[in-house]
Design a protein with these regions (language model features):
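Gly/Ala-rich beta-loop-alpha elbow adjacent to hydrolase catalytic centers
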Residues: 432-442
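Lipolytic serine-hydrolase domain surface
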Residues: 359-394, 454-457, 463-586
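Helix-loop module immediately N-terminal to the HCX5R catalytic loop
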Residues: 387-427
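Basic, amphipathic N-terminal segments
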Residues: 1-41, 47, 51, 55-394, ...
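Active-site signature of alpha/beta-hydrolase-fold catalytic machinery across serine-
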Residues: 443-447
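Glycine-rich, phosphate-binding/catalytic loops in enzymes
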Residues: 279, 448-450, 475-478
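Short helix-terminating capping/connector loops at secondary-structure junctions
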Residues: 420-426, 451-454, 502-503
């Protein structure tokens, strides 16, 4: 993939407005708010009433707001791709009126419903609940089917040749799987909420999945609620299958790393004197780290099992079998168990989050998950939490431009707001990123102007560029874009060289541990440390632990897996070499 000097980039991370989407986020958030309030007002407006005119007014007002919100989403004002190419485009509309109109309609409807809704209409079925639930589920199903068809068409029409190790998760079917899991999780939340409220005011029962015995306190809830509550039970045997597959793969990999040609002893010069216990521990760590490459299949097993459970219960409800009455007691037990599993899972997650305050290791793990979840700009979903990279990338870009002395030509003028302006002695910059930072660092490089690129080098540690992001988001991280990133770092020319191209020595090193379960190689698996010190490969290896031989106290060196890179000697070696190249050619 060639590197261009204009603003028409194929790589979206190079778009000038990729990390500047505050305007689009504001517009989308207002439209989301207006549409949500309109739907809620419609639900209230369809309740039984003795005042038909009130219903007409409420439904008309809510429909107008909903149509406006949906129509506005089709305009370029909320088009994120348009914003990426027009970073400085003025904002004429923020659609705040749509959000305010939706809130006003909802508040007016909710307050007036106290007098307008027919209080004498007693029913054991919540009005409009079943129809609304089925309508939402039908829309979600249609969207899922459309997404599956789209993926199938793309796979059969434009399936590109991908480099080894860059194949998308599940062969490109990850997007439908994630969407399916979102529907299932939303349905489980719906089930827990509806059943919890029903138990407060009576005894819940399905319409076609009746309880063991109906009484005056029986409250009928949609059968879909029971389907989501019971369907989650099938995830338990699926989890057992996943655990078995993980254990089998772990044993196979551990044996392979102990006996094959690419075994542990081949990576350590002193391996002949090393105890078998140390070799076994390293082989175990390598095997654990390799399991990450199978996580997509395992998640798919759980998701499909959950889907089968929900679908089976829903089919039984649609068939309206008379035998369902006989198993009313069993259904009650299954529903209680399913809701209990979901509530227990939520309690465990809350407990894990609380324990992270006292456990640094868990805090790093949860922090890594949070960083991954908040990497993408909020324009991908306007109600998402604040994006860390959206704040970090522009600031780091400005700092790098300032440190290299190129800020007078930078459109942001990063030093213009500083009074007095700082005295900066231009110098080369080595950008180092660890874990999630090793993904943010390439995003920074992609945003740098050409003159600055000539004075920049990149060092990535524990980088998930290929292993996670490249396989999950090939439209943003792919082998071609990794090549483009490498070319960006080698194609820049320094002012002092009179425009001559810098020697293609490479200014990017990606340090890899085989014990790392998150980071991995990008272009090719690295050679054993020592073999690659004299090469110019981007992917280079670091030994973890640094030695197989016991220390002075007889203890084996600890294995750090994904963490504690600060005490690893290999990054220092490669950082020194990158700095040497920068100072030599700039």
């Amino acid at each position: 993939m060639s590197v261009t000097n204009d603003d028409d980039h194929d790589w979206k991370l190079r778009k000038p407005g990729f990390w500047h989407g505050a305007t689009v986020v504001t517009r989308q958030r207002n439209l989301h708010t207006g549409a949500a309030c309109a739907v809620a007002a419609l639900s209230v407006g369809l309740l039984p009433t003795q005042h038909p005119m009130w219903r007409v007014v409420v439904v008309s007002a809510a429909t107008i707001v909903l149509v406006l919100a949906i129509t506005a989403t089709a305009t370029s004002a909320v088009d994120r791709d348009h914003q990426m190419d027009n970073r400085s485009s003025p904002s004429r509309y923020d659609f705040r009126a749509v959000a305010l109109a939706g809130v006003l309609v909802l508040l007016t409807t909710a307050l007036s419903s106290y007098w307008m809704v027919d209080q004498t209409a007693q029913s054991s079925v919540a009005p409009t609940l079943a129809s609304t639930t089925r309508a939402i589920l039908a829309i979600q199903t249609i969207l899922l089917i459309g997404l599956v068809i789209t993926v199938w068409v793309l796979r059969n029409s434009t399936e590109p040749q991908r480099a080894a190790g860059w194949q998308p998760f599940l062969g490109g079917w990850l997007a439908p799987l994630v969407s399916l899991l979102a529907v299932l999780l939303g349905g489980l939340l719906l089930a827990a909420t509806n059943l919890g409220v029903a138990r407060l005011f009576g005894y819940p029962s399905g319409v076609h999945l009746p309880a063991e015995r109906s009484t005056s306190e029986t409250l009928f809830v949609p059968d879909e609620v029971f389907a989501f509550a019971i369907g989650v039970i099938l995830t338990l045997p699926a989890l057992l299958i996943v655990a078995f597959l993980l254990w089998r793969d772990y044993l196979h990999k551990r044996h392979q790393f102990t006996t094959s040609d690419d075994h542990v002893r081949a990576w350590y010069g002193e391996s002949q004197e090393a105890p078998a216990e140390a070799v076994g521990q390293v082989a175990k760590a390598w095997a654990i780290a390799s399991l990450t490459d199978r996580v997509d299949v395992l998640v798919a097993i759980v998701g499909l099992a959950w889907t089968l459970g929900v679908t089976a219960v829903e089919i039984i409800a649609l068939l309206d079998l008379p035998q369902a009455v006989t198993f009313g007691g069993v259904l009650d037990v299954l529903v209680t168990f399913g809701v209990g599993v979901s509530v227990l899972t939520a309690i465990v997650l809350v407990g894990v989050l609380r324990s992270t305050y006292a456990n640094p290791g868990r805090r790093r793990g949860v922090g890594a998950l949070w960083d991954v979840a908040t990497f993408w700009p909020r324009a991908t979903h306007p109600l998402a939490p604040p994006c860390y990279a959206e704040q970090a990338v522009p600031e780091i870009v400005d700092r790098v431009v300032l440190l290299t002395g190129e800020w007078p030509d930078h459109p942001n003028q990063p030093a213009a707001e500083l009074q007095p302006q700082p005295t900066v002695y231009p110098s080369p910059v080595l950008i180092t990123g660890y874990s999630q930072g090793s993904v943010i660092a390439p995003a920074v490089v992609a945003q740098l102007p050409p003159r600055t690129l000539a004075r920049v080098a990149l060092l990535t540690l524990a980088c998930p560029f290929r292993r996670l992001y490249g396989r999950a988001f090939p439209a943003y991280f792919s082998h071609d874009y990794a090549v483009e990133l490498d070319e960006l770092l080698m194609k820049g020319s320094s002012p002092e060289s009179g425009g001559e191209q810098v020697a293609r020595l490479g200014r990017w090193k990606n340090v890899v541990r085989r014990t790392d379960y998150i980071g991995s190689w990008i272009f090719s698996p690295p050679c054993a440390p020592g073999e690659d010190l004299l090469t110019d490969a981007i992917d280079v290896a670091s030994l973890d632990p640094p030695s197989l031989c016991p220390g002075p106290g007889g203890d084996l060196a600890p294995i750090h897996y994904h963490s504690d890179w600060w005490q690893d000697p290999f990054p220092r070696i490669y950082a020194g070499r990158l700095i040497e190249r920068l100072t030599k050619h700039t």
